[in-house]
Each structure stands twice: as C-alpha cells, then as structure tokens.
Amino acid sequence: VIDPWDKSIIGEIRQGIFRDRFSKETVIDSILKIVSDETESVAFVVINDISRYWGVSNLFKYEELHSWDKLQRIMNILEDTNFLKNMMRKYSGSGVSLVIGEESGIKGLGECAMVFTQLPFWDTNNAHIGVIGSKRMDYAKSVPALREVQSSMRNVMKGWS
C-alpha cells in the first residue's frame, strides 16, 4: 500500500522535473524547493564543482539545532563543495545513502543527519542530491523523495543521451 504522501510527492517531483526539463537551472531550483519543503530539511545538489542549497530556515524547526555552533557547522558543510564531494565519494552506494550523527566525522554534529544519492544530470556523472537536517528527520519521506528525484531525472535524461 502506497502512503498518500508518497503518491503526492512522487507526482509533484515527476511533474516538476518534466515541466522544467529544458533548463538545467530551473530543474535544480524546482528539485531543491520541492525536496526541501517535503523533507523539512536543507536540500542540496553538488554538480561537478558547484554546490547549491535551499531551505536553511527548515533547520530552525528542530530545537536541537538552535545552537549557533551547530548552525555554523552545517552552513560550512553546505558551502564547502570539496567536503560535500568527499562525503559523497566516501559514503555513496547505488541507492540512497545515510550518514547519521558522528558518522560524518565532524565533531559536534551528533544531532544531524545527511541523506543523499547520485543524480543523473545532463553531461555529467558527478552529481548528487541530498538533504541535511536533524537526525530526527522523517526518513520515510526523505529516502523516497530522493529516490524519486533520481528515478525521474534518469527517465528525463534518457531522451538527452
């Protein structure tokens, strides 16, 4: 039985990607906003040597992340493309990967989690999408949302290769 949330978000992701498929920038914006809103976390993409993110305000929904130190560490991660690329390389599998708490190797981020997957994206195989937020995030929403982005992008990219 498919959860009604799953049907709703899957449809929204598919429609957003299909609608915006002719513009890389618009697809990125659409994906980031949908994933961030639905997961209540910060959504990010890393494509080659560029990273972008959306939804920093979602971090304020989690009391355990209200410390300036934690927020600053998260912002530093999001703004450090090399760090993100290394994390993806180290922990990536064929599906959706989870890095929870201190597994990241970053002291003081025991309350955080990162969920990410590889993303087919036009002319590169070096792209990932993910979310970072509280380790209390709703993984039942985060994992399917990222799987659907990956699947929808793979389907859209079939026509481009």
Task: Annotate the PLM regions.
Residues 2-161:
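Intrinsically disordered, acidic Ser/Thr/Pro-rich low-complexity regulatory segments
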